[in-house]
Structures are given as structure tokens and as C-alpha cells.
């Protein structure tokens, strides 16, 4: 019961409820034995009654709501002083009780020795009294020791908790300082960046404003120049001023050039504005980052305040616990004082009783003296009684003196402990003050930084307002239509201001929170409640932080999405406005064109058409370039999206790593706990061993005392008295020594505490230095980690040394005991002779034993303290690990939040891209609708154009989709490569881990061996001792009882050693089990790696199949694009309004470019934000990695098997999910592409409905055949999959190989049947192709007939031109009559100009109204875009806006109709005024109708050609598909054969291995091959069996070699062999993949050869067409020259006849001379024309005739053809080589493939022969045509020579001198006039008009000649251009 009572009050954490758990509640008094009084018992029972009263929990709370005051600290000091005082008192009482116990034992021995001197009753009473006193002292000693230990544990726990709290505060302050410093550094960097960006923005703004102003000036200047030239052209068109055709062309060219310059300036201006916007967005981004850092600082401040609250609460809890302990200690002190008072009272009563007995004894002595004479024996008895009483009195006096000394020492120790506690409390106060100072300083720093940042933010807001004002001014200056955008930007700024107000509110809330913090700090007192509340609040705060971060990110994303939506709406509105402006401009151009068409001649139209063709070609090339640029930007976007996905994957990998690190930490913590438990067990065992040793020593001591008693019985009373004196001396000496040792122990404890305090001070100083020197923090941490590691190693070494020292000491003590036994035996032999020496030796030996015992106790205490320190260090490290785990969890949560934000961002990006695409598609559909409404008022040409636009857009979308798929496939290929690299890295890591584990296992094995050897040595020593004791027992040197005791001790030690041996055996078994588990894990990892490698190979195969499908689809697209380009070229040549449409399309493309640029800018912003987030994450990860390295260094010996398995499984799950998502995406993309293809097919079917029924049936048949081929291809794929599955079955079950080979043969037969079916299909396709060729030939015949009809119609047009010219003559004759009518017409024209100006004014008003309406629309759209929740309403409003736009469109159409009506009225008035104009208009209408008919016929012919080409192209694609299928079949066959060969090779290798008896450590290289499933594998429980080789069918196996089951080296060797076999498997797979790549390369080369041959055929056809055109042009020119020469000859003859008959003799000479001069000039001009024609055409006649250039041309053509023939031969040789290679590769394939290849070779040979024959025929035709041309030219030159001779004859006739003089003067004047005219013509006319002839004498002939010569010059110019182009193409 006394034990229960001491247990109740031994620990401070005791609760009153625990009393109910005890069964025995009866109290037994300590002092009840040997006492007759009952007052002590009553007091004890009262104390027990008070102890059973329960205390309320609320009674421990303090009423004060503040920190500790001075009074409370004094109380704490007193309390701790009391605790230490009690501890010291109990220690002193323990020593006193032990000394009193020794004294009582001695007294009992003395009493038993002097038993004869006492009365029997007195002897029994005295002996009973001493025994009771001894029992009481034993019980009191036990309880005092127990209570002392409990109080020491309680004080140690308090100190540990205080040190832990201090360490938490210090670590938190250091981490907070680091974070704050880092944030401030980043904020300073952002400040610098912002300053730089603002300066750059201001510089750029100034520069851009200057440049934009210059651009505006230049654009205004260019606009004025354009207006001037347009005015000139208008004056020319209205007849105000007449211009030549050359000046008109020059003016139009200048207008075109000026407009292009103006466009360039406008694009430069847009670039400047775009750069300004980018800079502004970057500034906003940096500002948002600064605001984020502000918010993070505020959050850190909140966290800091909360942590301080927590620490204050912990301090209050400790205070409450101290108060509880104080109360318990007060109760104990009261008990001790009461017991002390009771003891004093007892001793006083006992003293009185002794004094009474002394008086009685004196009386008895007097009576004895009186009766001395009577009896001597009675006197002796009385003397003995007197001696006894005297002895008792002396003992009582000694007890009284001893108690006095103890009380004095107790008081001195109390004073010392009070002083030490005062020092400790002062230091605690100083630390508390330092912490408060640090807190205030940090709060001040944070507030200062926040105020600085808020000031900087206000500056930024001012700068932002300035920038926005400047931008508003610029936008007002340049674009009035952007007012709505500025409003939106102002709204966004208002949102920012609202965010700022929210930040201010948050700061106010923070102040409120600070006020609440002070109130909360005063209120929180209870420890257990506060701990739970703190944990809950921490969790809530973490959740709130995550929620706040998510809300902030959501707000940012919403703002960005609103901004993007606004920009998108603005762009859409701009597009619509631009479209409307383009429509108005087009309408104006149409009006102008209609006005100019009335007055332009037919020649002008021809020139215009030629120029338009060039411009259209240039525009088409520019369009293609722009399309390529747009495609490149789309590819960049795809790459950015792929990068975002990769960053997402990287973030997933980081998350998995952190999870694995967390699991590692948890395992390390568990392992440390296990180690700690093992150390505790070892320490307990050591303590138990030491206790056993002490007991043995006590027993030895008791044995010696018994032996001494036997010796002392023979001594006399004097010797007894002397012994008593010596014993008392020894006791006093021992007491003094004990007190001295206790003082030294206390001194050592105080010194340890001082060392701890100095260490804490040093730690505080180190923290301060770390705060001042953050740069050296990493190095110091690394050093501290190294020191900690060294300390751990030292600690481990100390434990091992302690163990070794303890064993050594035990051995030494045992050897000492043996020596002492020998000495005792010698003393026993010489007991009679050397008794005094024996006694002194015994006393010395006893003293030495006691000194050794004290030393051992001292060492024990030191080691116990060292163990406590190690335990404290371990607990501190455990707390640090817990904190680190919490930090890691927080980081993990942060990374999860970042991942969520990244995924949200990526989803937003994808959503925006999809919205962008949908908006673009909607926009295109809307544009098509508008175009369809416009097409109602236009002709069939515009219908064709809209169809072309639709088709082009669809093709572009398809090209974009295919390119996106290509980019995705490239990304997948990169991912596969990365997976392979990662597998290699994992393999290397696995090898390293394996080596490390192997080393660890070998070290453990060696350690176990060492321990086993030590145990064996100890067992041997014990057996030696046993043998010695048995020998001594035989000799009879020791007594039986001693031998039995020794044997019992030795048996106990033997049992202990057996237990240790069993523990070692268990450890060994555990190690073997761990090796087995490790081996199983390694096997699982190998299986996982092999599965992953198989999956990667399957992925690669699927990727290759997808690439092939995409390549095929891309080839189809290219063929469609080529066909479409051909149609487009033919349509471009005939369309009128294409140039304006191209300009419109260019503007649309530029708008799309702007949209894409904006999207790219957004993506750049997102990418930069991601980079910033990545940088933050990388920094945090760097810190985490540093901490991880620390923990890894500390925990090198930890096993991570479970975590590796879990992480592998999770990675596999994530990989599977990722691959699943990829497969789903691929499926969705394929479905989308198939749907697009179906839509395209439907569109093509609608377009080709006009074709004949035969073509429809053919197309249906073609589609059916394609479907059959697709089904066939799918069946082949299905069979390929079944083959793969069968190959896997082959790998798993060896005996199914023959069945699978049989199935393969069956599949081969099926393939042969399919090939025959394919050949039938190919024949049918060839027949249909033959039919199509026939239809094509018929079509070409029809086209030739149409060309003939066109030629006839052109001749009719020429006749009409001549008629028009005749009417023009008649108009000139009636010129005088029409002058008055012209005056009237001019007046009418002026009125028309007025009406036109009115129309312009109406147009301007309309444009103003339109802009206003657009502004209204923009405002409405802005209102719609304010809220994201009203998306449905936006659609309705957009539809309303579209209806309003349609109404406006109808209004525009009505205005157009009004203008047309006005124009018709004006035309009617013109018809009334002039009948001649009516005739001209009628003739022009007839011409236009004929032109339209011709164009319609030409378009029909063109459509027929395009359909024929399309069918031809479809057949070609069919052939290509069939060839691809053949190639795939051949590859499948090859793969099957290779797989079979590989299996046979593997079988042979396995057979060889079996024969060579090397199958002990063999494992199949294929993990799924002949092995059991991973779930069926069994891991051995305790013993490890060797891996059995797979038993093959039909093979006799030898016996397995011997295998060491317990050797880990052999097991690791087995794992290494397995890895080598896996590497062989991987190399085999890589070889297969490289062979597949080579086959794909050969297939690509075959396709390239086919394309090259197609290009050759096209070039030859173009070459032949060129020669035909050249021959036709030459024949036409020769005929025209012949006609001209015949006219000249006729005119000269007629003139000569007139001169001979009609002229007078005086004037005849002059007229004759004039005509001769004119004829000579004509002849010279004809010669120049002929020379120009011969030089320009390059149609060279042979060298023997008149020109060398024709021969040069022929030579060049020959050389080109020879080069082409050489190229063709080389390509043919290359192709044949490749075919031979393919033939070698397909030797094992079917014979049909060879036949097809041979047939293709024959086709190519026939094509080559046909080309050669065609070339020879063309050369022969050219030679014949050149001979005919030469003949005609010789005839012409003969005629010219005859004319020359006639003129010279006329010149030779003599004239009179007067006539000659007059003639010479006339000739001089005539020549001067001609020279002036020539100079004027050279200056004004262009180069191609220098051949004009001005014949002034006869206007009729000169005008006709001029027109004819102009025609010839134009034709010559076109021929020149064609020849130059052909040269360029040939080069």
C-alpha cells in the first residue's frame, strides 16, 4: 500500500482518476512496526483521505490573462527549488537509511555475539526491535528511491519540453527569416525589372509616337498623291482631259505602288502598337507578381502570429503543469515534514523511555552493589545491562547528531539549488525577452516592407494611369473606333482597384487579428485543450491558405479570360467593319470600273488581262507564303501546348517523388523508433545485469560477514568493543564520503546544466549569425549535418564501447573476485598464526570492494546520463523529423495546388483554343452566308469564287489538323524516347541500390558473425569458470552452499547467454527473410521493367502505324491540294474581280495573323507565368532536396523496399492513366478527322452532281472498292493483332509453338487468297482507268473543237473591231455636227459629277452612321462580356446584332439599287443625247455577251478536265494504297519469320546452357516466357531456396548443383545474371526496331521515285505545249508580216502610177520625193520589225540562213532534254537498285509481289520509250516548221530587195535645180519634224511601243499600220516573256 501511495504522488502527470484502477486501497503505515503509539497512523490516514479528493480541471487555470509576472516566476523558482530540494533530501535520506541499516545489522550481529550476557527475554525483545527497525528502513528506502526516480523523470520531462519548445521557436524564426529574406530579394528583383520595363516602355512609347507621327505624315502624303492620280484618271474617264494609254498605265502603277507603300506604313504602325501592348502587359504581369509577393508576406506574417500564439499557449500549459507539480510537491513536503515531526516526537519519547530505563538501571546497579557480596553473577549481569544501556544511549546520541548534520547539509544544498534555479529563471526571462524583441523587430520589418511595397504599388498605379492616358491620347489620334476597348480597360483597372481595396480590407482584418491575438494569448491556459485547438487551427489555416490561393488564382484567371474575350470580340468587330469597308470599296471600284469600261478600248482590255494574270500569280504566291507563315505559327502554338503538357507531366513526376520521399521519411522514423526500442532494451538488460552483479556482491558480502561471525564468536569482549569502535569510525568515514560524492554529483549535474545553457546561448548566437549571414547558411547546414552524423557515429561507438567496457569490467571484477577468493583461502589456512593480518586484510579488501562499488555506481550514473542525453537527442531528432514531415506535407499540398492551377491553366488554354477555333469556324460560316447573299446580285464568276474560298478553308483546316496530329506524334515519339532514357536511368539506379543493399547485407552478416564469436568466447569463459569452481569444490576449499550459489549464478548467466544466442539466431533468420523479400521485390521490379519495355515497343509499333496512316492521309491531301491548285490556276486566269478579292483575303489573313499573335502573346504570358511558378517550385524543391539529402545522410542504413514497391505501382497506375488519356485523345482525333473527311466527301458529292450518270456510278463503285480495301486492311490489322497475341502465347507456353506456326501458315493461305482478290481488283481498276483514258481523249478532242470555235469567234471579233473603227471614222467626219452635242454632254457630265459628289457625301454620312452603330454594338458587346454567367444571353444578343447587320446589309443593297437606277437614268439620258454612244454600248454589250458565253464554255470544259484529273488522281491514290498494303503484308510476313527464327535461336541457346550445366542461376530472358505469373510466385518464409530452371519438354536434366541457402552473395549473383539476360532481350528488341525503320525508309524512297516520275511526265507535256505555242506564234507573225509587206508593195505601186499620170511636172518631183522618203522609212521600219521578231522569238534559223539564235535555242533544248534523259537514267538506275534491294528483302514473300514490280518496271520502260519517241517527233516537226519559216523569210527579203531597186531607180531620175533645192529644203524640214516626233515618242511611249510609225501623209493607212504594228509589238513582248519563263523553269 505504501508503494501505491508513493506511486500516486511520484509523477506530476498523475490524475486522480487513476486511483480507481488500483485494487488494494488499504493503507499500511511505514512506522507501525516497533511502535506502540497510534498518532502517526491517524495523521497518515488523514493525508490519504485528502489525497482521494479529486481536483477539478478548471482549478488549474490562472485568472490572469497575460504572460508570467515576476511573482509567478518567483513561485516557479520556489517550486523548482522545492523539487530539487526534495530530490536532494531523498538522496540524503537514502544514504542515511543505508548507513542506519548497516548499523542495525551490525547491532544485530553484536547482540547475537553477546547473547550470553543478556537475559533471554531482553535478548528476544532487543532482537525483535532491531529486526523491525531494519524492515522499516528497507521499506522506507524502497519508497524513497521510487519517489526520487519519479521526481527526476518529471523534472527531466519538463526540461525536455522546454528545450523542444525553444528549438521549435528557433527553427521557426530561422526558417521565417530565410523565407522573408528570399521574398524581399525577389521583390527587389521584381522592382528592378519593373523599373527597367517602365523605362523601356517610356523610351519605346516616345520612339513609337515619333515614328507613328512620321508614318502618319508619310501616309497622308501618299494619300494625297493617290488622290491626285485618281483625280487625273477620273478627269480622263469623264473627258475633262485626255490621256494616253501609257500615262494611264503609269498612273495606275503609281497608285498601286503608293497604296502598297501606305499598307507597309500601316503594318509598321500596327507593329509599334502591338509592341507597346506587349510591354504594357509585361509591366502588368510584374505588378501582379509584386502583389502576389505582398500577399505571401502578409500570409507569412499571419502564420508567424499564429505560431507565436501557439508557443505562448504551450508556455501557459507548461506553467499549468508546473503548478500541478507544485501542488503535488507541497503535499509531499507536508507529508515529509509531518513524518519528520512524528519521527522527532518518536525519538523524544524514546529518549524519555531510555532515560527512565537508565534510572531504573542505576537503581538496579545500586541494589546490585548492595547485594554484590551475595552473587557475583548478578553483578556481571547488571554490568552487562549497564553496558547495554550505555551503548543504547550512545547510539541515540549519535542518531541525534547525525540528524542534525543531515539537516544542516540539507539546508546548505537547498540554498545552492535555490541559487541555481534563480540563475536558470533569469536566463529563461532573458530568452523570453529576446523572443519578444525578435517578434517586435520582425513585425516592424514586415510592416516597413509592406508600407514600402504599398507606396511602390501606388506609384505603379500612378504610372499605369499615366500610361493609359498616353495610350488613350494615341488611340484618339489614330483610331476613333477603339473607344470601347479603352472603356473595357478602364473596367479592368477598376477591378484592380477593387482588388487593392480588398487588400486594404485584408490589412485591416490583419490588424483586427493582431488585437484578437493579444486577447487570445491572455485567455488560453489549459494544455490538453490548447494542443487539440492548435492542431485543429493549423489544419484550418492550411485549408484557408489553399482556399485563398485558389480564389486569388481564380480571380486572376477570370480577369485574364475576360480580357481575352474582350480582345476576341474586338477583333471580330474589327473584322466585320473591315469586311463592310471592303464591300463599300469594292462597290466603288465596281462603279469606277463600269465607268472606265465604256471608254477603254479592246487593246487596253488585252493588256489589262495580261497584267492581271501576273498580279494574280504574284498574289497567289504571297498568299501561299502567308499561309506557310500562319502554319508555322500554328506549329509553334502546338509546341507550346506540348511543352505545357510536359510541364504538367514534370509536375506529376515531382509529386510522385515527394510522395516517395514522405514514405521514406515515415519508414526512417519507424526504423529509428525500432532502433530506440532496441537500445532501450539493451540498456535495460545492462542495468539488470548490473543489478544482478550487485546482488552477487551483496551475497558475497553476506557470506563474508557470516564467515566473520564464525571467527568473531571466538573473540573476547574487548575485541568486540574495538570492532564496534572501528565500525563506527568506518560508518562516519563512509557517510562523509557519500556526502562528498553526492555533492560532486550535484556539482556535475549543475555543470551539465550550465553546459546546456551555454550550448543554448551558442545556438542563439549562431541563429543571430545565421540571420546576419544568410549567404553562408547552406555551408553551415552542411557542416552541422556532417557534425550530427559524426555525433551519431560517436554515439554508436560510445554505446559499443560502453558495451565492451562493461564486459571487460565484468571480466576484471570476476578475475578480482577469483584473486580475492584465493587470498581468503590463504587467510583461512593461516587463521591461527596471522589473525591480525587477516583482519586488516579483510577490512582493506572490504574498503576496496566498496570503493569499486562506488566507482561502478558513479560510472553507472554517468552512463545512465549519457543514455538519457542520447534519448533526448533522439527525441529532438524525432521532433525535427515530425516538423520536417509537416513541412513536406505543406510543400506537397502547395505543389498539389500548383498542379491544380497548372491543370486549370492548361484546361483554360485548351478551352480558349477550342473557343478560338469555334469562333473562327463560326466567323467563316457567317462570312460564307454574307458571300452567298452577295452572290445573288453577282454573276456565276463570284459563285465559283465562293466555292473556291470554302474549299480552300476546309483544306487549310484539314492541313492544320494533320499538322497538329504530326506534332502530337512527334511529341509522343519524344516521350517514348524519354521513357527509354528513364528506364535506363532507373536500371542504373536499381544497380546502385542493389550494390548498396548487398554491401549492407554483407556488413550485417559480418556483424552477426562478430557477435556470435563474442557469445562463443563468453560461453567458453563461463565454461572455464564452471570447471574451475568444480575443481575447487572437489578439493574441498569452498563450502557446499557457496558452490551451489556460484553454480546458480553461472546458470543464470548461461541462460542469459543462451537468450542472446537465440536473439542472434532470430536476427539471422530475420536477415534471411529480408534477403528473400528483397529478392522477391527485385524479381517484381524486373517483371515490371520487362512489361514496361514490352509496352514501349507496342507503343512504338502503334506510333509507326499512326505515322503511316497520317502519311497516307497527308499524301491524299497533297494530291487534293495539287488538283485544287490546277483548278485554281485555270480559274484565276479568267476571273475579273480576283485582284480585289485577293486584297480582301490578304486583309483577312492579316487579321487572322493578329488574332494568332494575340493568342501567342497570351500563351507567352501563360508560359512566363508557368516559368515563374516553375522557378518558385524549383527553389522550393532545392530547399526540399537539401533537407532530403540531410535526412538521407543520417538514414543511410534504412530499408526502402515497401516505398519502392508502392511508388512503382503508383507510377504504373499514373502511366496507365496517362496512356489511357492519350488513347482517348487519339480516338477522338481520328473520329474528328473521319467526320471531317465525311463532310468533305459530302461537299465533293454535291459539287459533282452535275456530272453524268456514268461518272456517278463509277464514283460509287470506286467508293465501294475503297470500302472493301479498307475492310481488307482492317482484317489484316486484326490478323496482325491476333498474330501478336499468339506470339505472346508462344512466349508464355512453349509447347504451343507448333500450333501457332500452323496458324501462321493458315493465315498465309488466307493472305494469298486476299492477294488474288486484290489482283482482281487491280485488273478492274486498270480497265476502268483505260475507260477513263478514252474519255479523257474524247474530252481533249472536244476541247480542241472548242478552241477552233474560239478562233472563229476571235476572227468575228476582229471584223467587229474593223466595223467599230469605220464607225469611228464616220464620227470624226461628223465632228463639227457633234461639237454642240459635246457641249451638252459636258454639262450633263458636270451634273453627273455633282450627283457623284452627292453620292460620296451620302456614303460619308453612311460611314459615320455605320461607325456610330458599330460603337453602339461594341458598347452592347462590352456590357455582355462583363459577366461570365450570362453566356447564353450573349448568344441571343449576338444573333440580334447579326440581324441588325443583315438589316444594314439590306439597306446597303437598297442604296446600291438606287445608285444603279440613277446610273440607268443617266445612261438613258446619254442615249437620248447621242445615238453614236448607243451604238458603241450595243457593240460592247454584244462583245460582253460573247465573252461570257465563251467563258461559260471554257469553264465547262475546265470542269470536265478537273473531274477527269480527280478520277485519275483517285486511281493513283488507290494504287498507292494497294502498294502500301502489299508492303505491310510483306513486312508482317518478314516479322513472323524473324520471330520464328528468334524463338528457334533461343531454344538452341537454352539447350546449350542445359547441356553445359550452367542453369543454376539461369532465368529466362523473356519475363513472360515459361514463367509463372507474378501473383503465383511464392517467397520463402525463413529459408531461401535457389531459383529452379524452367523444365523444358523432352530434355533430360542433370542434378542441380549445390547452392548455399544462407549466402546473400550467391543470391545477388543470381539477380545479376537475371539482369544480364534482360539486357540481351532489350538489345534484340532494338535490333528489330532498327530493321523496321530501314524498311520504312525504303518505302519512302519508292514514293519519292514515283513523284519524280510524275514530275518528269508533267515537264515533258509542258515542254511539248510550249513548242506548239511557239510554232503557232511564229506562223501568225509570218502571216502578219506578209500581209503588211503586200500592203506596202500595193501602196508603192499605186503611188508610182499616180505620180506618172496625175501630177504636174513641177509638183511631181516634190510629191515623188516625199513618197520615196515615206516608202524608205516604211522599209526601214519593216526591217527593224523583222530583226526584232527574229531576235525576240529566239526561234533560230540555221547558220546558213539568216540567224544563229534559232540554232542556239535548238541546242539548248537538246541539251536540256539530254540532261533530263541522263537524270532519268540515273533515277532509273537508283530505282532499279532499290527494287533489287526490295526483291532481296521480299524473297520469302509471295510471287505476286514480284510480278507487280516487274509490271511496274515495264510501265516505266514504256513511258521512257514514249517520251523518247515524242521528243524525236517534236524535233522533226520543229525542223520542218523552221524550214518553212526560212522559205517565207527568203521570199519576203526578195520582195524587199525588189522594192529597194524600184525606189533607187526612181531616185536616179534627174531633177531640176529649183525642184532639187525645194526638195532638199522640204526634206530637211521633214527630217527635223520626224526627229522631233521620234524624240517625243522615245520620251513618252514605253519600250514596247518604240516601233510605232507616224505616217502623216495618209491618215487612213498610217492609223491602220500603227495599230497593226502595236499588235505585233505586244505579241513579240508576250513571246519574249514566255521564253524567259521557260528558260527559268528549265534552269
From Swiss-Prot:
Domain of life of the organism encoding this protein: Bacteria
Keywords (alphabetical) are: Coiled coil, Cytadherence, Virulence
Coiled-coil regions listed in the entry: 1626-1659, 1768-1846, 1903-1930
Its GO biological process annotations read:
adhesion of symbiont to microvasculature
Q: Which InterPro entries match?
A: Cytadherence_Hmw2
General function of this protein: Component of the cytoskeleton-like structure which stabilizes the shape of the wall-less Mycoplasma. This cytoskeleton-like network of accessory proteins containing HMW proteins 1 to 5 allows the proper anchoring of cytadhesin proteins in the mycoplasmal membrane at the attachment organelle.
- Name of the protein in question: Cytadherence high molecular weight protein 2
Gene, per the UniProt record:
hlp2
